[in-house]
Design a protein with these regions (language model features):
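Residues lining hydrophobic/aromatic ligand-binding pockets adjacent to catalytic sites
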Residues: 1-253
Length: 253
């Protein structure tokens, strides 16, 4: 399956406050939400996998209910990132990827979000990246890292990601400053909102500015994953649809 060069979606799709005509029609049953979402977007970031690992049958259902060219980004288990803190992870990683395997070619990327106040540990990051690049079910996948402590914003961390062709997740609206740093052949962008984390709307002007950045990344030959995580009040859906429209009108996608 050839993946699109620019994929725009939201962090999650199953939000009750998106119902009642915010995005989902009040007449649309919840069991059909994913199908409707996939009619409007090419990708979704699955956050549920961070909190609990769904059954293989659930991943298989997501695969069957979405179009051929649809792409999933799966958020890595917090057991691995927040409890194990990247150490001694061979078994939990194997378990995680075994469960996600029914997504097959639709598994576009895996996001590893590290916890706040977790300081940079070079050895842990290197060993974890080696595992990801050698385990049978993960070595061919795209991996992105969202650092939530500024100590990871360093040249040594970026060098390690570049060595393994893993992406530094560019996160806007988080508690950390936005850094535009490409470390792989793909871009992973998370838009959390501006002034209020998860609860700010991006203006059309701001979205046009993001579109220009995305166009630049695309022109350099990179695949770009964009996920809006400002889900409060339906801002994520609104902003994702607007950004997609802006880029389509400019023939960027």
């Amino acid at each position: 399956m050839r993946i699109s060069m620019v994929l725009i979606g939201t962090s999650g799709y199953n939000y009750p406050h998106w119902w009642n005509d915010v995005f989902y029609s009040s007449r649309l049953p919840q069991r059909k939400w994913l199908e409707f979402y996939a009619q409007n977007f090419d990708t979704v970031e699955l956050n549920v996998s961070f909190y609990r690992l769904s059954k293989k049958e659930t991943f298989q259902s997501w695969y069957k209910r979405t179009p051929k060219r649809f792409s999933f980004a799966v958020k890595g288990s917090r057991f691995i990132t927040h409890i194990k803190r990247l150490k001694d992870c061979r078994e939990p990683l194997s378990f995680f990827f075994d469960h996600a395997s029914p997504l097959k070619e639709k598994l576009g990327a895996v996001l590893w979000q590290l916890p706040p106040k977790f300081k940079f540990q070079q050895e842990s990051l290197e060993k974890f990246c080696v595992l990801l690049s050698t385990l049978p079910r993960s070595k061919l996948l795209r991996h992105a890292f969202e650092f939530r402590d500024e100590s990871w914003y360093c040249q040594e961390a970026f060098r390690i990601l570049e060595e393994f062709n893993f992406a530094f997740c560019m996160a806007h609206g988080s508690v950390l400053p936005f850094i535009e740093k490409a470390t792989s052949d793909f871009i992973y962008l998370r838009l959390h909102g501006g002034e209020v984390l998860y609860g700010s709307n991006y203006s059309d002007k701001e979205l046009r500015q993001w579109a220009e950045k995305i166009e630049h990344w695309k022109e350099t030959g990179k695949i770009v994953f964009v996920y809006f995580n400002n889900d409060a009040y339906g801002f994520a859906i609104k902003n994702a649809l607007t950004l997609k429209k802006i880029m389509q009108s400019n023939s960027i996608i």
